[in-house]
Amino acid sequence: MADLIEIKRGESRFHTKIDWLDSWHSFSFGPHYDPANLGFGLLLVNNDDIIRAGSGFGTHAHSDMEIVTWVLDGELEHRDSLGTIGIIKPGDAQRMSAGTGVQHSEINPSSTTDLHLLQMWVLPDTKGIAPSYEQLSISESLASNELIPVASGQGHLGAVAIHQREAVLWVSRLSAHGSVTVPSAPFTHVFVARGSVHLSSEDKKTEYVLAAGDAAQLTNSNTSRLTASAEGAEVLVWEMGIK
């Protein structure tokens, strides 16, 4: 199945909870630091955030990072120093390349509904590029019960482009008992956003059950499959090469 596989349970993640934010961090982030958990492959941040209605992150700065946001519920209002204003909804792929430096805010514009999103940071393959922003809707493709490219450094059609040739983010919304093949790669990060899945080797001799919030980190992975439970599932898979 893989030379190495490590299962990370959702409850083991770092946790930040304040009046307007409930955030779970897969890797070291902010005040949460573990030198043994600084990321996986090229993925440095995998934050699972619930932002209360009318709240959010005020203007703050980033540089030399590829930032991908995936909304699960609600809407996100993005504003940045490039003059971009975007509303990101479920089914939208959004990428901000921080490059030489950019400031932005991320707000839940609703007065009644909480916002649930995943934000992921990936190292760029080139530092000092011009900052940029891209947003695309891929909702129709997600109905196919397949892995759909959401953010890609390899020119996948329909995906936002990231400045990292060794990384592709795939998303699948699986119906009950739906199944997809996990890409083989030096580093593969599987995160379950909703529902639950079985991660199994091709011969089905090895199997793990992953619930919402759980992740699997596969190193030098061989062929494996994700199969949704009866409730279905939404999974995000980072396929990554060598740094």
Predicted feature locations:
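Jelly-roll (double-stranded beta-helix
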Residues: 1-243
